[in-house]
């Protein structure tokens, strides 16, 4: 198997499912991009720049629990290369952000399958996100995915 490791910044929306107090849906997208981190005496500077290429699209279903945890499943399509399906490892968590009007959270997903170049994929994806009161999501993924050789 061949290992690929990459990071993407997704932006999109999350919101409640009509008729359910605990279920939500999320949709977000990430363009092809470069991420830059510079460490220096003046602190940490970061930047994300969109570049030419295709985009990734995430679609997921979330069920939240009273203790601030949640489970999630869904798919991420990586342009025309294919997609992966995922489910939560254990439970994710959400908490109030120190920035008023935002919630922050994190979750780890296991890759349960895929298609196209991702057929037979395995691996883990971490998601570290912030959600505004209006449902706008900024979500940073780090993926370690194993692809079949050939």
Stretch-by-stretch model annotation:
Residues 1-150:
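Beta-strand-enriched cores of mature, soluble protein domains
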């Amino acid at each position: 198997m061949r290992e690929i490791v990459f990071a993407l910044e997704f932006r999109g929306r999350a919101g409640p499912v009509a008729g359910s107090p605990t279920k939500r849906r999320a949709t977000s997208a990430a363009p092809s991009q470069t991420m830059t981190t510079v460490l220096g005496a003046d602190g940490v500077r970061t930047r994300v720049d969109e570049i030419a290429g295709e985009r990734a699209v995430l679609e997921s279903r979330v069920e939240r629990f009273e203790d601030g945890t949640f489970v999630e499943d869904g798919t991420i399509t990586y342009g025309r290369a294919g997609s992966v399906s995922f489910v939560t490892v254990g439970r994710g968590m959400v908490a109030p952000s120190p920035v008023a009007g935002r919630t922050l959270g994190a979750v780890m997903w296991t890759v349960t399958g895929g298609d196209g170049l991702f057929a037979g994929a395995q691996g883990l994806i971490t998601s570290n996100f912030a959600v505004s009161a209006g449902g706008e999501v900024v979500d940073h993924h780090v993926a370690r995915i194993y692809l079949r050789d050939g």
